[in-house]
A protein has these predicted regions:
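A conserved acidic beta->alpha catalytic loop
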Residues: 40-48, 90
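Cell-envelope/extracellular polymer assembly enzymes that use nucleotide-activated donors
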Residues: 6-8, 35
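Conserved donor nucleotide-binding strand/loop of the catalytic core
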Residues: 33-37, 48-77
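Short, well-formed alpha-helical segments that are part of the catalytic scaffolds
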Residues: 15-29
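Acceptor/aglycone-binding surface of glycosyltransferases and processive sugar-polymer synthases
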Residues: 63-77, 82, 91-145
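Conserved sequence signature across two-component system core domains
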Residues: 9, 13, 39-41, 61
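Donor nucleotide-sugar binding loop of glycosyltransferases
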Residues: 16-19, 43, 93
Length: 145
């Protein structure tokens, strides 16, 4: 069982001004995390300002480098013993972060999966299914999302 104070939350964000402040505020209200890092991946809106106003530490990319680069920037900067990566658009309920944290320390990797219902396009769904299958094969465990 990991304590939330040992967890850095890494949140890549690109033009998420409409949601990032609320997501950060809900995370902060739910637990005393080590830190919440929002990686502003070249946004042209108020993403960084709203994340900072809600209490996050913001790492800025001067231009869009992509989600993978944003996640890497956040993980490299994270000071917590554990790192939880979460989207800034609110598709994952922030309160679910604590449900994942209770498994940290028991396992080397904890993966949270979204519900089967999704708004993704058919092409994106097929791509996700392929990557999920590969991840499941490589880990020897079912990874549904």
């Amino acid at each position: 069982l990991a304590d939330p104070s040992s967890v850095s939350i890494v949140m890549p964000a690109m033009n998420e001004a409409a949601s990032v402040g609320g997501v950060v505020a809900r995370l902060r209200a739910d637990a005393a995390w080590r830190e919440i890092l929002v990686i502003d991946d070249g946004s042209s809106d108020e993403t960084a300002a709203r994340a900072e106003a809600a209490g996050a530490t913001v790492i800025r990319h001067p231009y869009n480098k992509g989600n993978g680069a944003a996640v890497k920037s956040g993980i490299r900067r994270a000071a917590g013993e554990f790192v939880l990566v979460m989207d800034a658009d609110g598709q994952h309920p922030p309160e679910d972060a604590r449900r994942i944290v209770v498994r940290l320390g028991e396992y080397d990797l904890v993966v949270g999966a979204r519900a089967a219902a999704t708004q993704a396009t058919a092409a994106r769904g097929a791509g996700n299914a392929l990557l999920n299958g590969l991840a499941s094969y490589l880990t020897g465990r079912p990874i549904p999302d």
